Amino acid sequence: VHAETSTGAQSDAKSLVEIAHKYNCLAIVDSVTSLAGTPLKVDEWEIDAIYSGSQKCLSSSPGLSPVSFSERAADKIKRRKTKVQSWF
């Protein structure tokens, strides 16, 4: 979670992504409350997957979810060998 509106807390997404990559993990950022409201440099920070919601900081109609995947994440998804067992 990049930011939390009820407390005003914001994580250091850049550092968390660096830690994930250090251990060869993908980094996912929940930017529902931060996209368009605070600096968020998806390409520069090399975020692998990021999603948001239109109803929060974007202040738009609810029901839309902007999503972006890096080439690294897309490649990992394409190479998946097992089906997703559950979406819940």
Residue ranges of model-derived segments:
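Active-site phosphate-binding strand-loop segment of PLP-dependent enzymes
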Residues: V1-V32, A49, C57
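Short, well-ordered, mixed-charge alpha-helical segments that flank or form enzyme active sites
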Residues: T5-Q10, L35-P39, E44, L58-S61, ...
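Poly-acidic low-complexity segments
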Residues: D12, K41, S86-F88
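Alpha-helical scaffold segments in soluble metabolic enzymes
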Residues: S15, K41, G53, P66
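An acidic intrinsically disordered interaction segment
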Residues: L26, S31-T33, K78-V84
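Conserved active-site segment immediately N-terminal to the catalytic lysine
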Residues: D43-Q55
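Active-site C-terminal subdomain of aminotransferase-like
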Residues: Q55-F88
